[in-house]
């Protein structure tokens, strides 16, 4: 079969193997095949016959090298190689011999090869030129004839047979001597050139088919390959660089330098090759890392010095690397209001001042209203109405801590801003302000399919807003301590008990603050409020009375639920007795080692180490039903449950709210964060750590408790519904016959009489039936309203809401109290059946409840209620209401309020089954994502299914990632793309923190502050490029690489020099320009314009060439820029000036590229971001568009050729 002639391979490719090892033999006759490492590369340096009887039937692997003495010209000897990728044209040296003679010498080859060479004709010659241009003939026929004639003679004599017999002897050791010169040439990259050895290995009689170079004795199968080899390697002219040892010529000095490395001893050679042939000349004095460019070292030094010269104009975050800054700007990470590191995205550092306010575009309306309040101007009704349409945002926790520290408030409050929540002139705690600050009052309800508010409800809300505005003005005008004057003003209630009167001083005069009413008259707040309250009372009289009958059913269901809970808990106790895990102090049994350890270490009252903590609770507290709760349960409930916050015997009530706030920010703090939290709350670090652990266990047990399934039993249908038929059609939501919310029953009971309220004390989970009865009874006889601001629960299956289930008689007496959140403060049974009050479509203002049946456009919302005044029959109660009957600093959970109905997710976001939080399915407002406040109103349109949001929700509580949730579906999912790697089985769940809270790579010794950084770092090991351009199909490791690459297709150039006006599409190019060319870029721009004018006048020169010639004549090249490099930068034959300009800009094309080992812990993210700027592919793409002009005076003065770039690409895994 005819041997296929292989085409020449591409020239500008890097050889894969740098150090192929070969064996040398003394004589061609004694060559024995050995395995060659370069067989796969198709690199045949010599090919020789096995000298076997039937050579055509034997597979040979010509891997051995002859001694140089075996051939006059080292025919088929060691072939010196170099690793240069570019072989540019040079002048020609003529060297000819007749192909006919060559073919005659090759008579031992197969007939197919003869046909190939006959086709060339006998006149085929090789022309080469010497420096003077003369032509000479070098007849190499004698060399070929001598060798091939000798070979044929040996084959006729049967030497091959004797060699075969000799090799088959078992007592003979075959030694393959190596020539001394071989050591100096091992590892020469040119040994891997497929394009110059087109004969595949193992070809029979392959040696006879080779054409040998007369200069270096390299063998080639085709004459064209030999011509190219001589042309590119052995021509000499004045512009080439010649190797003094082997006479190889190179077009670039850098190629010659790397080639000279191959002549060094093996140890030195390996060291220099690994160091990039000495190109990394800039070494860090701190850590010893070396860099090729001086500006790379400069930016690296900022890691050690902490300098961060780049600052984001939006969030004021600073960066040490321009690449990090560019990535931050490009990814729009600071668009939202909450940033990664606790910074408000409004140009104000959070926590810098208690007066810090939000000034982002989304809060522009709030800012305008705040300015009016600061100037003492009353708000018009239109502005007050506009406040209702301001979307609320989460308040940064740093602001929250500063506010508490400044004003001395220890309790927690709903952690939101919006309305006037975060825009108070004095930064007063948000709970003292707008009652609607907890929810998105102004959400575009029609967009989500809900009707708008009716005018009646709007009027009531306006009253509340006016009160808030005036309170804010009063706080602005008065000193901080003067706010206490507002605490004593309450309407007297004759039903209150005498001890309640001692809470506030009755001698404090009323504070009458002026406010503008509808008719423009100035009234006091009290008069105006009471007037509107009376109007709202009239609205309540239209409510139905069917809810009375539902109360009894709800009470019965609650009793059954509590019985089930107590029974299940007793069963759990009995089960734990039989387990072998018992406490060494109190001998109490536990189902496993983990609960046992937690009990022994932190909860056991017999443990001496925690007796001091439990000292206030040494006495066992009996409840009404005789169920005793020991100290352990008290501590557990005080630590885990919110119901302990208001207990008079809870010593930690001043700390729990702060702990909950920290817990909502980060559920798994490391040791450093725990220390900070313990200092902030004033508790021991071990206590804080255990609190976090118990909190997680508590929530997990609530979500997994099997006993909660029993709460899903439907309640009995209402036996005597007496709903007014005239009101039912106007209800926005049809009442449900079989299921009603227990919260509704509590609402009815809370306003029917004026008994003192029963404050929930710390109690165990075993709360008996009698206590519940007493609780319901006291609620049914109390004028002090219940709190409905946080009736959410994670433990209910059956709760539903009935908008028409409130009777006017029961609801018209007293307003609801929002100061006592119920979430996790009540016994399990109550919590399990009390979770849907938010959707009951009722809005109360002070003493008023406006029925949704009166407002058919949109269901009302109980979460808009804030009790600020009582009616004239109300005395001061024990709720510690400091401001108009409300305690603004009472303890509340971090995210108490549920979202308004207008903020519910679209239908596609409703989960089919709630698995992790049972019982939340019937009520959309209790969806899991609602517990994260900004997720309550940011349902991006880009994500079409609940599965998309479910995927995002995995990371919603991770510290530093909440800000990305505000950026919408596309940006947030792109952030998750960088954080997850399903193909390589890398997920956040599998990444474990070290003891110091860092994330360590399991393949190297690097650690990172964020798991996402570690996942991106893993790309360096796996080589995966997950981000692919859809236009040119190039792939990148990081998304911001793809973002900047896409600008090459779109033509976008967002970066512009303010001096010369030049624009850049890549941040790395822009940074390099500003760092090294800014000082003279204006002059360069003027020179470029002059060169263009001159080119237009001459008509035959390119402006770039003129500019370059002028630059060299002016000697503006920096030191170290050698003549050879000048020649490199000059245009060469066959290249257009445009290509020359692009190639000259290669020195800047590799901007900001850093090796993978350059990333530091402190600036790991910035180093990754910077890698975009240094990605050679991306920068080279930009250069192909002609973005850059040639800069010949770079500060570091190191221009690299295309071969340098490709080699570096291989080093950094970028190719």
Curated annotation (Swiss-Prot):
Keyword Repressor applies: yes
Protein name as annotated: Zinc finger E-box-binding homeobox 2
Stretches with biased composition (Low complexity): 780-808
Binding region for DNA: 644-703
PTM remark: Sumoylation on Lys-391 and Lys-866 is promoted by the E3 SUMO-protein ligase CBX4, and impairs interaction with CTBP1 and transcription repression activity.
Sequence ranges of Basic and acidic residues compositional bias: 89-98, 1127-1149, 1168-1179, 1186-1205
Any single GO CC term annotated in Swiss-Prot or TrEMBL for this entry: nucleus
Biased composition (Acidic residues): 1157-1167, 1206-1215
Compositional bias ranges of the Basic residues kind: 12-24
Modified residues (Phosphoserine): 142, 356, 360, 364, 647, 731, 780, 784, 1122, 1124, 1203
Cross-linked residues, Glycyl lysine isopeptide (Lys-Gly) (interchain with G-Cter in SUMO): 391, 866
Domain of life: Eukaryota
Source organism (scientific name): Mus musculus (Mouse)
Positions of post-translational N6-acetyllysine modification: 377
Record flagged with keyword Ubl conjugation: yes
Region of interest (SMAD-MH2 binding domain), residue spans: 437-487
Cross-link (Glycyl lysine isopeptide (Lys-Gly) (interchain with G-Cter in SUMO2)): 391, 479, 555, 611, 632, 713, 866
Composition bias, Polar residues: 57-74
Subcellular compartments: Nucleus; Chromosome
Entry GO MF terms: DNA-binding transcription activator activity, RNA polymerase II-specific; DNA-binding transcription repressor activity, RNA polymerase II-specific; R-SMAD binding; RNA polymerase II cis-regulatory region sequence-specific DNA binding; zinc ion binding
Ranges where the record places region Disordered: 1-111, 702-740, 772-811, 1117-1215
């Amino acid at each position: 079969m005819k041997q296929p002639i292989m085409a020449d391979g591409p020239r500008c490719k890097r050889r894969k193997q740098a150090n192929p090892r070969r064996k040398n033999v003394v004589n061609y006759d004694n060559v024995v095949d050995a395995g060659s490492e370069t067989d796969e590369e198709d690199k045949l340096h010599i090919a020789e016959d096995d000298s076997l009887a039937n050579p055509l039937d034997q597979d040979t692997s010509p891997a051995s090298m002859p001694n140089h003495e075996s051939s006059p010209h080292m025919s088929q000897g060691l072939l010196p190689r170099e690793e240069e990728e570019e072989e540019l044209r040079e002048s020609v040296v003529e060297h000819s011999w007749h192909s006919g003679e060559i073919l005659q010498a090759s008579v031992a080859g197969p007939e197919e090869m003869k046909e190939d060479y006959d086709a060339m004709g006998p006149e085929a010659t090789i022309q080469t030129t010497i420096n003077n241009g003369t032509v000479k003939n070098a007849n190499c026929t004698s060399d070929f004839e001598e060798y091939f004639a000798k070979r044929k003679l040996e084959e006729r004599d049967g030497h091959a047979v004797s060699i075969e017999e000799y090799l088959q002897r078992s007592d003979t050791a075959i030694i393959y001597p190596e020539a001394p010169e071989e050591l100096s040439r091992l590892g020469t990259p040119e040994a891997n050139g497929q394009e110059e050895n087109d004969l595949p290995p193992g070809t029979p009689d392959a040696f006879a088919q080779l054409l040998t170079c007369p200069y270096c004795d390299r063998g080639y199968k085709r004459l064209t390959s030999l011509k190219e080899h001589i042309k590119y390697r052995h021509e000499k002219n004045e512009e080439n660089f010649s190797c003094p040892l082997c006479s190889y010529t190179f077009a670039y000095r850098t190629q010659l330098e790397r080639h000279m490395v191959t002549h060094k001893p093996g140890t030195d050679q390996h060291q220099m090759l690994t160091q990039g042939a000495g190109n990394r000349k800039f070494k860090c004095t701190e850590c010893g890392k070396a860099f090729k460019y001086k500006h790379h070292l400069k930016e690296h030094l900022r890691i050690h010095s902490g300098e961060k010269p780049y600052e984001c104009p939006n969030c004021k975050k600073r960066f040490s690397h321009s690449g990090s800054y560019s990535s931050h700007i490009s990814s729009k990470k600071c668009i939202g209001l909450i940033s990664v590191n606790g910074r408000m995205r409004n140009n104000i550092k959070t926590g810098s001042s208690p007066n810090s306010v939000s000034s982002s575009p989304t809060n522009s309306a709030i800012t305008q209203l705040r300015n009016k309040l600061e100037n003492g101007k009353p708000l018009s009704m239109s502005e007050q109405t506009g406040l209702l349409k301001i979307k609320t945002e989460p308040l940064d926790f740093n602001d929250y801590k500063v506010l508490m520290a400044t004003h001395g408030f220890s309790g927690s409050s709903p952690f939101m801003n919006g309305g006037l929540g975060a825009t108070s002139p004095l930064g007063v705690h948000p709970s003292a302000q707008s009652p609607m600050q907890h929810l998105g009052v102004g959400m575009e309800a029609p967009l989500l399919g809900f009707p708008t508010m009716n005018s009646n409800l709007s009027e009531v809300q306006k009253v509340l807003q006016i009160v808030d505005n005036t309170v804010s003005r009063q706080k602005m005008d008065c000193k901080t301590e003067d706010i206490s004057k507002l605490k004593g003003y309450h309407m007297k209630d004759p039903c209150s008990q005498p001890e309640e009167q001692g809470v506030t001083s009755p001698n404090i005069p009323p504070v009458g603050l002026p406010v503008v009413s509808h008719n423009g008259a100035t009234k006091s707040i009290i008069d105006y409020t009471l007037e509107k309250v009376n109007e709202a009372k009239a609205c309540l009289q239209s409510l139905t009375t069917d809810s009375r009958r539902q109360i009894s059913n709800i009470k019965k269901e609650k009793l059954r639920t509590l019985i089930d809970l107590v029974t299940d808990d007793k069963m759990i106790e009995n089960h734990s007795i039989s387990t072998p895990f018992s406490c060494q102090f109190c001998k109490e049994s536990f189902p496993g080692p983990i609960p046992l350890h937690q009990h022994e270490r932190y909860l056991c009252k017999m443990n001496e180490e925690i007796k001091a903590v439990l000292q206030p609770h040494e006495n066992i507290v009996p409840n009404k039903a005789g169920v005793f709760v020991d100290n352990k349960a008290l501590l557990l409930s005080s630590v885990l449950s919110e119901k302990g916050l208001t207990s008079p015997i809870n010593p930690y009530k001043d700390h729990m709210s702060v702990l909950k706030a920290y817990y909502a920010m980060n559920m798994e703090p490391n040791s450093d964060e725990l220390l900070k939290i313990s200092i902030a709350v004033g508790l021991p670090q071990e206590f804080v750590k255990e609190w976090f652990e118990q909190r997680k266990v508590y929530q997990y047990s609530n979500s997994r408790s099997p006993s909660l399934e029993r709460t899903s039993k439907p309640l009995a249908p209402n036996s005597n519904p007496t709903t007014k038929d005239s009101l039912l059609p106007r209800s926005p939501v049809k009442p449900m016959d079989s299921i009603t919310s227990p919260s509704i029953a509590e609402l009815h009971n809370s306003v029917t009489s004026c008994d003192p309220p029963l404050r929930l004390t710390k109690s165990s989970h075993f709360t008996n039936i009698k206590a519940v009865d007493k609780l319901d009874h006291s609620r049914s006889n109390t004028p002090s309203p219940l709190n409905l601001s946080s009736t959410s629960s994670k433990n209910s299956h059956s709760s539903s809401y009935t908008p028409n289930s409130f009777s006017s008689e029961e609801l018209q007496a007293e307003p609801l109290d929002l100061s006592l959140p119920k979430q996790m403060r009540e016994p399990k049974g109550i919590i399990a059946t009390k979770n849907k009050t938010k959707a009951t479509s009722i809005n109360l203002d002070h003493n008023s409840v406006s029925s949704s049946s009166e407002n058919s456009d949109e269901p009302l919302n109980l979460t808009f209620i804030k009790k600020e005044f009582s009616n004239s029959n109300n005395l001061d109660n024990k709720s510690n209401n400091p401001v108009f009957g409300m305690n603004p600093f009472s303890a509340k959970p971090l995210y108490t309020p549920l979202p308004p109905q207008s903020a519910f997710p679209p239908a596609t976001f409703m989960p089919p089954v709630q698995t992790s939080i049972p019982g939340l399915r019937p009520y959309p407002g209790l969806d899991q994502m609602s517990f994260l406040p900004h997720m309550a109103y940011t349902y991006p349109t880009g994500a079409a299914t609940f599965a998309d949001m479910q995927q995002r929700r995995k990371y919603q509580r991770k510290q530093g990632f909440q800000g990305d949730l505000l950026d919408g579906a596309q940006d947030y999912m792109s952030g998750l793309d960088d954080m997850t790697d399903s193909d390589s089985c890398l997920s956040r769940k599998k990444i474990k923190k070290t003891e110091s809270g860092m994330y360590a790579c399991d393949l190297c010794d690097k650690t990172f502050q964020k798991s996402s950084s570690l996942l991106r770092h893993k790309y360096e090991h796996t080589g995966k490029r997950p981000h692919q351009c859809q236009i040119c199909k190039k792939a990148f490791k990081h998304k911001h690489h793809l973002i900047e690459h896409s600008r090459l297709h779109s033509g976008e150039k967002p970066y512009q020099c303010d001096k010369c006006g030049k624009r850049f599409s890549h941040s790395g190019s822009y940074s390099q320009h500003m760092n090294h060319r800014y000082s003279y870029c204006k002059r360069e721009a003027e020179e470029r314009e002059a060169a263009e004018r001159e080119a237009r006048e001459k008509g035959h020169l390119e402006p770039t060439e003129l500019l370059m010639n002028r630059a060299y004549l002016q000697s503006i090249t920096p030191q170290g820029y050698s003549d050879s490099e000048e020649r490199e930068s000059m245009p060469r034959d066959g290249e257009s000036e445009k290509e020359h300009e692009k190639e000259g800009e290669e020195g800047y094309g590799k901007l900001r590229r850093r090796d993978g080992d350059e990333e530091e812990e402190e600036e790991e993210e910035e180093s990754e971001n910077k890698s975009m700027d240094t990605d050679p592919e991306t920068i080279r793409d930009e250069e192909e568009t002609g973005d850059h002009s040639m800069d010949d005076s770079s500060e570091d003065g190191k221009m690299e050729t295309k071969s340098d770039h490709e080699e570096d690409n291989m080093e950094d895994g970028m190719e």
